[in-house]
C-alpha cells in the first residue's frame, strides 16, 4: 500500500522512541494481563467519573529535529549581554572535559539518589569531595552534600539556628542589611510560618537588639564590601547567639575561612565553580556547621563507613534526620539536593586543584583591582575600599552610564542609589575591563591595562591583611592529581563505572518515575542562549526564556486542569511548601488565618507532613482501610473535629499504595464541605497525564515533579523542579520575587527560591518532552506506564503477593510487593532481595515505603517488554533462591541473598559458601554484567563512627 507524505514524514516518531514496548509487545502484555486494548485496561482501572472525555489540547507530536529547531528559534530571542550584575550569580567557564564526560553523560545524569550505596559509590565519592571542598573553604567540621540554592540554605540556617539555640525564649533572627535581597526574601518567607521576627539592620548594630537567637552575616556584602566579622562574632558567641555567615566559594579561595573566625554555620552558592548561571539555576548550595550541631543539619550528608567485608565504603549518613523517616519532626522537608551541580563543582575543584583555583581567584581579583584603580584615576569614588570581585561605583549621571553599557551589550547592577555595581568573574578578560571603562568613563578614557596592572601589583590593599587566607586548602591527593585532561577523563569514567544508572538498566523505584531522559531533551540546556543569562538581567533580554516558560506553563495548565502555574519552586518539596503557603495566605485573606490543621493520610510520603510543619500547620493523620484507601469515615470525623480550623488535606493520586481510589472526588467534597482546600501531591502525575487531571478531580493546588513526569533527569539526587498549579482563587498567593517583578507574574507574595523561575535552565527539557510527544503521545505514555506496572504485578503476584489492588485486581502505575510473609517463613527480608537484585544488574525497588517490609515497583512507560521480562525473571529467580533457603538447602546465615551483593574480589578469593561462585556473581548469565565495587554497607558503623571528609587514596584502590 502506498504511503502518504504525511505518513512518511512520521511526525510522531519520538513517541515510539520514548515508549518502551512496541505495538506487538503491547499486545502480548495486554494478553498476559487479560485486557483487549490499552483503552479497555484504563477503563478497568481509572474511575469512570474522573476520566477525561477529550485529551488536553497541547498540540500534536513533532520530531526531535523539528522541536530542536523550534526551541532554537525561541532561545535566539534571548540577548547574550555580558552580565556584571553579581548578587550571587556570575559567568563561568565550565571545563569542556566536565561538560562532555559528566554533564552530558547519561551515566551521571540519569542516576537516582544514592539510597542504595552499593550501586552509587562513584557519585558518593564525588559528593564526598564536594564536602571536602566545603570543609576546607569554610573552616568548619561537617558539611552537607548540597542544598537547593543559597537563599534556601539561608532559610535552613535560620531554622537550624533556632533548633540548636540555648536561648529558648528568644524569637528574633537578625539579618545584616547587606545580604543579597533574594536571600532576605526567602528568609522572610520561612520566618513568617515559623513565627520568627526578622530584624534587618547594619551588622554593627546587631548588639543593640535583644532576644536574638541567630544572626545572618554576609562575608562579602551584596555590594562588594569585605567584612572582618571576627570581633563581632566573638561578642555574639559570648551572648550564646548562633552565627551564620553567607560566603562565596571563589572568594573563600583567597579570604579567611568564616569558621576560623568563630561562625557556627557557613553557607553559600557553589555556582561559580563551573555551573552556568542558566537564568537562575539549577545551582548547588554548600552548607557547613560545627560538629556539635551535626544531628541538626538539613539535607544529605555523605559519610565513610565499612562494607560487610570490612572495606571502606561510602553512604548517606544519619538519614534519621530526614523527612522520609521523621516526617513532621524532620529537620527540613527538603528531600532533593543538587547532586549533579554539586558534582560539577566538585570536579571543577578536582580539575583545577588548589593552585588553579588560586590562579583563577587571583586573576578575578587582579582585574577588579585594575578596574578600581582606573576608575579612581578618572575621579570616580568607590563606596567600599575592601573588595574581592565587586565594586560599588558612585556615578554622577547613572542613566548615561547605563545607556553606554547597554550600547556595549553590558549589564551593570542598577538598583543601588547613586551608584552602579560591577562584579567580575573567571570569564572576564582585559578586553572586558576596557569595555567597562568605556561604559563608565567614556570612549576617551585613555587607560591602559598593563600600566594599571603594574600600579596595583605594587600596592593592592583591597583585601585587608587580617582577611587573607593563611592556611592551605585542598591538600588531599584527589585535588592534586587529575589536572591533565586525560587523567581527568579517566577519573570521571572510573567514578561512573561504579554506579548503576538508566544507561545500563531499568531503575524500578516506586514513586520515583525513572523514565527516559531523551538526548534531544537534554541538548538545549547547554546552549549558550539558555546557559549564559543572569536571572536579574533586564527582562527584555530574556524574551526567549519568557516565551518558553509561558508555553510550558500553558501546556501544564491544560494537562493539570488548573488555571495558573508558578514556576518558582526548584524541587518537589519546595513545591509542596509553596502550595501550602498559598493555601495559608488564601485563608488569611478571608480572615480565616486560624485554619491551620492539615489532614494527611497515613500512606503519605514523608515530605508531606514535613512540608505542612514548615508551613506552620498542625498535622492530623487520616487512617487508611485494609485495602489501602483513605478511610472516608475517619476522614469525615477528622474534618468535623477540625471544623473551622481545617486548612487542607494533602492527598496523592493515584495513592502511594499504587491504586486509583474510587472515592477521590468524595474526599475532595468532604474537605471542601468543611472549608478546607485540597492539595493533590503531583508525585504520581505520570499516571494521570491525558487520562485525568487534578483540577478535573476537584483539587485546588498541586506541585508537579518535572523531574519525574516531565523528563528532567534525577541527576543522582537533583536537580528537580516542582512548579505548582493552582485554581484561580489561589493564584494571587503563589510565590513572587523581590528583585524580578515582571508583567505576568501572578503575585507579590514572598519567594521560596532564590531565582524567580527556580531552575529555569532545565525547563527546556520538559518543553521538549511535551512538544515532541503531543497530546496523544502524553496519554500513551501514561497508559503504557499503567500497562507495564500491571504486567509486572500479574507475572509476579504468585511469587510475591501484591499488597494493594483496585477494581478487578488492577494496580495503577506502580505496585507494592509484600515481602512480610516470606520473611516470616524464611527470614529473608526485603533488604536481602534488594541487594540480591544488584547481582542481577538492577537497582532495587523502593524499600519499606509506604509500608514496612515491602518493595514498591514503578517500571515507567520507557521500559521495553524485554527489560521488564529481565526484571521479572530476576525476581522469580530470587524467589526460587528463597525457596531453597526455606527448604534448608542453604542456611539462613549463608546464602546468595544475605551475602548479596557479590563483588569481583570475591570471585577470585577463597570460596567457602554452600553455593557456587557462578550463581553468586552471574545469576543472569555473562551478558552485560554490572559489578558493584563494595559489599553490603554497615549502616550502624557509619552512623556511630561518623566521618564525612575525604579518606586516603589507598582506600579506593
Curated annotation (Swiss-Prot):
It comes from the Bacteria. Keywords: Oxidoreductase, Pyridoxal phosphate. Its EC number is 1.4.4.2. The modification N6-(pyridoxal phosphate)lysine is found at residue 708. GO terms for cellular component: cytosol; glycine cleavage complex. Disulfide bonds: none annotated. It is an enzyme of class 1 (oxidoreductase). The glycine cleavage system is composed of four proteins: P, T, L and H. PANTHER family: GLYCINE DEHYDROGENASE (DECARBOXYLATING) (PTHR11773:SF13), GLYCINE DEHYDROGENASE, DECARBOXYLATING (PTHR11773). Belongs to the GcvP family. This is Glycine dehydrogenase (decarboxylating).
